[in-house]
């Protein structure tokens, strides 16, 4: 009984939040209509009332949402931890049948999702054989359980911090293969099922697409490319009843493991760096490694705590008339991105650097770089 009350209260709160704008407008309009009536504008009041009713109806119509049922399947790519893991749990709580792909089939994320009733399959989006097996498994599951494919969520991503010249060819290639080509490949392989079920495609984008930042040039490029691809795909698939949406979930690096291997990435950069570059960057590289390694510790596997992420995500998943982009951003991000957009480059570049707050550059060759692994912080502490 308490669980039922909790669910009902939660739904009521969500309903009030979603329609709070129209409630406020209608209340203001009602007060205005009473004022007009008292002032003697009796013929104007019916016309204004009809306009208010029509506007309220259209607003509620636009804001209306579909319902989720157990025979609705949602595919989420990249669910080992972080956002993918959290969205898989949330979609399961909504009542959907969730199909989650993981890189590590025996990892803690896969095991916990399996305990929650999520269908977990192994998938490396850069491996064509894996893709084929995953698609066959999804097709079999949909047919066996008579499921309707409701949505594909492209979430798999790799982010490597480090200036562009430092990153190895393998690191750059990995980000391109997972973030951009991986999403394109899995979507293409699932497209026949997506068309048949008039499904929805949600692409996880990033604020780095809106404003690329130093240190993640390749990552920003993959997210910008992914968004451009999704925009064109949205226009192509609209006539088939397939909706394509970009979802920007916001920043939660400290709650995610997306940077857990950053120390090893820095070591690879140092090992492959030419001698000239080592002397040029010197202590700047070491300071950079220490700074960003401090925020790249592996975190405990937990569901993301920001409730706003799930509120915005539900709009992308359930709105009958969805927007092209859904963003979860704090007032700080909103102000920064507005300033980035309206200020000249000389000022916006300064704001971006202040926003990132990386270690300062003190000139070339300030100190010869320590070529040993001791130059990097010990991640075991």
Show which residues each predicted segment covers.
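Canonical Rossmann dinucleotide-binding motif of NAD(H)/NADP(H)-dependent dehydrogenases/reductases
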Residues: 57-99
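Rossmann-fold cofactor-recognition segment
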Residues: 115-129
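Conserved NAD(P)H cofactor-binding loop of Rossmann-fold oxidoreductase domains
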Residues: 155-160
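Active-site helix of classical SDR
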Residues: 187, 222-225
